[in-house]
């Protein structure tokens, strides 16, 4: 087992539903610890920068618009195999395909408004965490 960190973003749709606490409880039950967190309204520049890898994809503009449509809750999570553990909690990107009991099955509205983001690899997690948090803001516990 490897101790890892991953980035998690509770997206505007889930924040609007007031389910941040319910989602955090799932993280904790799965053994993931919040080691950094911030609640904020993303600027267009922040959203475009974060999702720059998708810039040429047809859904890029809609994704950016959605991510700036309301506040988000951003957290770095730490735990054994955190990337996979978090992605398992999230479920499939399309909530219609997500297993019952996953965050997206329970809280997401559509493939676009899918409740949460999760890093897809340890390498990307490090990049994504550094995008939103200074090293001094991430504290193991």
Curated annotation (Swiss-Prot):
Leading EC class = transferase
InterPro entries in alphabetical order:
NDK-like_dom, NDK-like_dom_sf, Nucleoside_diP_kinase, Nucleoside_diP_kinase_AS
Is Cytoplasm there in the keyword field?
Answer: yes
Give the required cofactors.
Mg(2+)
Look up keyword Lipid biosynthesis and say if it applies.
no
One BP term from GO: UTP biosynthetic process
Protein localization: Cytoplasm
Complexes and interactors? Homotetramer.
- Under what name is this protein listed? Nucleoside diphosphate kinase
Q: Which gene encodes it?
A: ndk
């Amino acid at each position: 087992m490897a101790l890892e960190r991953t980035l998690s973003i509770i997206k505007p749709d889930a924040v609007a539903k007031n389910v941040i606490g319910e989602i955090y409880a799932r993280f904790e039950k799965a053994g993931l610890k919040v080691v950094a967190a911030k609640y904020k309204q993303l600027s267009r520049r922040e959203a475009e920068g974060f999702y720059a890898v998708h810039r040429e994809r047809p859904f890029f503009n809609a994704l950016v618009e959605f991510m700036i449509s309301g506040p988000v809750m951003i957290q770095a999570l730490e735990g054994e195999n955190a990337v996979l553990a978090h992605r398992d909690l999230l479920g499939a990107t399309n909530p219609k395909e997500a297993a019952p009991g996953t965050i997206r099955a329970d809280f997401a509205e559509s493939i676009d408004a899918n409740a949460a983001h999760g890093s897809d690899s340890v390498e990307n997690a490090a990049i994504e965490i550094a995008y939103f948090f200074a090293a001094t803001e991430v504290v193991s516990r």
